[in-house]
Structure formats: C-alpha cells, structure tokens
Amino acid sequence: MKVYFAGSIRGGRVDAALYERMIKYIQKTDIVLTEHVGNLNLSEEGKIVTDIYNQDTNWLRESDVLIAECTCPSLGVGYELAYAERFQKPCHIFYNKNRTSLSAMLAGNTFYNIHPYEDEAEIYPLIDSILQKECDS
C-alpha cells in the first residue's frame, strides 16, 4: 500500500522526530511516498515551489491512504487533507490532545478519521489497524 504521510514542514519542525518514527514504523509493511517529511535535516532551500506542489499533488493522487500528524498546525497539511478528500482518499489524522486542539475544520468534517492520543505508544496499534483496514478495502 502507498501511504502519503503529512506533517508540518514550514509550520514548524518540533515533531520531526515523531514523524520519522511513524514513517519508519509504516515502512516496515508499506511504502511511504513522503518519507522526507521525517528527515530531521529537511530543507526546502533552493527548491522551486511549483515543483514541490506538483510532486506532492502527484503523490497524493498516487497514494492509497493519507496519514497526518497534526499536533503542530500547518497550512500545508490542511491543504493536503483537503486535496486528498477531493480525490476520496481515506484520511487519518493523529494529534496529541494534551498539546493542542484540532481545528474545527478538521474535527467537524466527518470525512476524516480522527485519532487523538496522549502517548506516542497509542499511535502504532492504530496505524496497524488503519493499514490492515485499508488493505482489506
């Protein structure tokens, strides 16, 4: 299965290490098209924004499922979620409920599968369940 992993890049990299761990976990069984999101040394310096947009939207269309970590607010992740919804891609949103409140634009949209958590250890069994469910679909 091809997974589009979404996490904050320009909105803040405070959770980059978490993204990296989530991506590596998913990669044990599936393909993560956006593995660069978990790169702790990620830099978009020198990249042409239209190239980034075209690559990311191509990956979104190619993906089977979108998994987003939304604890750190990001305009880009919000756009990616809306884009995935447009193409009816299953979307799963994770966020640490002790650190943030999810935007009503996401939490109030019944298309999205919302997964609040308190501890990182809660994430991985949910990912297993998501990937198994989407694989069976």
List the predicted regions and their residue ranges.
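Conserved catalytic or regulatory cores that recognize and/or transform ribose-phosphate-containing ligands
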Residues: M1-S137
